[in-house]
Amino acid sequence: MVFGKRYRDKETGIIYDENGRPCKTCNIFSSFRNVAQQPNSSTVPEVKSNTQLESKQSSIDCNTNAIPDSVSFPRLPDVAELGRSTWTFLHAMAANFPKNPTPTQQNDMSSFLYNFSKFYPCWSCAEDLRIWMAKYGNSPRVDSRESLCEWICEAHNDVNERLGKPLFNCQVWSKKASELAD
């Protein structure tokens, strides 16, 4: 196993970061729970580096005195929950963007979107967004509320298409979203 690159374990489906640690935001909470509840025996996958060993041990050791299911505690969202919340946020933000933004507002929004694509908690999702944004014609359109709404919709459609979900009519969506914000 080579560290320094993010990857998904084919057996467990868990996504690991470049240091060999599970990406908590990218993985569904139940996946961590299942791995953590594995007995500390020969059924645990072979470990090929100290970093991987420490990672697997800490995930197991942290859960030996697990909190009962009846106790509520904060948790990170799984990737699907994170995605739904993110699209709600981005569509709402675009719908509330000024109809005629100043050059400063345009610059701020463009910077936000580029930075957002660098720091989004799901690294593979962030990378997909950066790749999409780098394609010709896909840089953020921030010259008006309607153009930003349409751009967010197109980005959302790119994700929906890869996931096999229905696509939005972005021209209709951007007009409706802009009207709702007024």
Swiss-Prot record:
S-S pairs: 122-125, 153-170
Function: FAD-dependent sulfhydryl oxidase that catalyzes disulfide bond formation. Required for the import and folding of small cysteine-containing proteins in the mitochondrial intermembrane space (IMS).
Protein name in UniProt: Mitochondrial FAD-linked sulfhydryl oxidase erv1
Gene: erv1
GO cellular component: mitochondrial intermembrane space; mitochondrion
Cofactor: FAD
Keyword Disulfide bond: yes
Top-level taxon of origin: Eukaryota
Location in or out of the cell: Mitochondrion intermembrane space
